[in-house]
Amino acid sequence: MWRLKLSEGDEESVNQHVGRQFWEYDNQFGTSEERHHINHLRSNFTLNRFSSKHSSDLLYRFQCWKEKGKGMERLPQVKVKEGEERLINEEVVNVTLRRSLRFYSILQSQDGFWPGDYGGPLFLLPALVIGLYVTEVLDGTLTAQHQIEIRRYLYNHQNKDGGWGLHVEGNSTMFCTVLSYVALRLMGEELDGGDGAMESARSWIHHHGGATFIPSWGKFWLSVLGAYEWSGNNPLPPELWLLPYSLPFHPGRMWCHCRMVYLPMSYLYGRRFVCRTNGTILSLRRELYTIPYHHIDWDTARNQCAKEDLYYPHPKIQDVLWSCLNKFGEPLLERWPLNNLRNHALQTVMQHIHYEDQNSHYICIGPVNKVLNMLCCWVESSNSEAFKSHLSRIKDYLWVAEDGMKMQGYNGSQLWDVTLAVQAILATNLVDDYGLMLKKAHNYIKNTQIRKDTSGDPGLWYRHPCKGGWGFSTGDNPWPVSDCTAEALKAALLLSQMPVNLVGEPMPEEHLVDAVNFILSLQNKNGGFASYELTRSYPELEVINPSETFGDIIIDYQYVECTSAAIQGLVLFTTLNSSYKRKEIVGSINKAVEFIEKTQLPDGSWYGSWGVCFTYATWFGIKGMLASGKTYESSLCIRKACGFLLSKQLCCGGWGESYLSCQNKVYTNLPGNKSHIVNTSWALLALIEAGQASRDPMPLHRGAKSLINSQMEDGDYPQQEILGVFNRNCMISYSAYRNIFPIWALGEYRKLMLSL
């Protein structure tokens, strides 16, 4: 049976692997009854996979209940009847909160974080399989049990039409259909395998024009595998890394995720690396295309992309650019004497890859460049220590649930979840009962702050100084994020006001100051905050976005979510410590508020770039404005934002926003006007803090009723539709949100009731 291991490992670590989570298969773990129960959970997911596409993380919950939950007394469940919203009393809310916290405490690890599923995208796992196959370590790295779960996951998320979406809830795309099909074939699936699933996938591919219509990232992976020709790719010249940094399109000016993906891609492209050909690859050349492989016009194929994948079509200028580079630039760079320049560029690129690997302890900033960097290390030296170090960190990205084994969008969301959970628990005022949860979470925050910059001179490697920041996940992944740092600072400051015997010693003042300095260093001239770094170039550069599938990837844009979080963290810090850089901090806050005001949309909302979508960003927009001292009465922006949220409340009392809002940039309800507990919580939190109770408390009562009645028998909340997003078009799962935000919203609602 699969078992989650926590904070373990022999690899190098800055904090003894605090926060690490990985699954191992243990033949001795679990009784026959427990194994039968796990199989029942799997079967139930498969049976309902088309109506409920999101797993509920039931394997981890089962393990926690087995190890910590047995014998724990359950409080009776409470419900609020229709029409009795005004009669909700403190006892009803108290019971609901205690049941929620009791359940959530079982899920917390000893090191203070809450392990969980951070999956959703469907292009990550196939890329890993291809990468391991190409490096000839697939079966040695992914055991038979791993491959069983990977097959289960891929088949569970195949759509009825035979294809796979960009994410678990998405319509079928050529990108993920081809890559998923290829991954299954590389793991030994036959042409007619999966009870017809393979044939169905092949039919989808052929019906939509064949694999020449896969977008550029897919063309790249197929070329590495040898199932597509490099001449069918648009150029990825590594020489870009040799250009002067003063140029606005230098790779070092790009958003870090973008440049860290195209960095190893340029190495493999520059080497024109191709896997050793075998019978399976030759067969794939026949299976994936509608015409014989040797008849394909690869130059035409360069710019072909299925309409299902085309979220960001190439502007004409981009096609002209790639054609010129392909026709004139590449032939010159492949011949003497300019081939010496290419060799120098390839060496430079590998130096950047090694820098990223070593400073991130071979975790890397994310799963895409993790696999690409690993492959580059193998191409450079197949028996290198760098490659071996990469292999030992693959498990950090894999998660097992009832739908199978997936590759997560990061090595987890540990720090982010902890910072939000702390604020949620504090909002309940039940600290005397659940102080141990806070103490452990406090330790996690203290243990994961980045205490030094990356090695050498970070600027030479286009890295922003990171001392004092917090990353999204663990201390071993040292890419600090603006909102993660701000939320961690806020949580640490709130905990510093609590009794030491309950929550532990506060963070040292020096560490808090480092966090403030890091936040201040990230503010752009327009007052906004981007995600990881300062915005280094111009939005117009999006014209060279080559991905087709993702939007807004070229530079690190400013976001209302990050800007609001920065305001909140800085305001709380200067409230508690008015002597440190007060003038600079106040100036920063004022500029940030101006940015939020300017980016508000005419209907009163803000567009969300990291959560779904207008509800999420509007919560942040309101929170930032209120933290700065604005009020409903004094701010037209806040009044418009509250009006927007109230206009979206559903008949059932809740709110429910579809991921299509992110994709189409138009507010869209969930199908059937269904409510969502997390959207409802965000809206309630915003309205409560903006003083809605003094104007008309009924919307709050109705929203609270929706949350109370959604709680499950064991104190958990149901997993509903996907709520995370990145790059406008790809959704990702935040499995902890279903617990954190109802607790937070009902905690604030309880405080509101006591004040009335």
Curated annotation (Swiss-Prot):
GO biological process annotation, one example: triterpenoid biosynthetic process
Annotated catalytic residues: D483 (proton donor)
Enzyme Commission number, as recorded: 5.4.99.7
Keywords, comma-separated and alphabetical: Isomerase, Repeat
One Gene Ontology cellular component: lipid droplet
Tissue: Expressed in roots, stems and siliques. Low expression in rosette leaves.
Statement: the UniProt record of this protein carries the keyword Isomerase: yes
The keyword Repeat belongs to this UniProt entry's keyword annotation: yes
Disruption-associated phenotype: No visible phenotype.
Sections of the chain in a coiled coil: none
Substrates-to-products reaction catalysed: (S)-2,3-epoxysqualene = lanosterol
GO molecular function annotation: lanosterol synthase activity
PFTB repeats: 147-188, 512-557, 589-629, 638-679
Function: Converts oxidosqualene to lanosterol.
Family label: Belongs to the terpene cyclase/mutase family.
Protein name: Lanosterol synthase
UniProt organism field: Arabidopsis thaliana
Gene name, Swiss-Prot/TrEMBL: LAS1
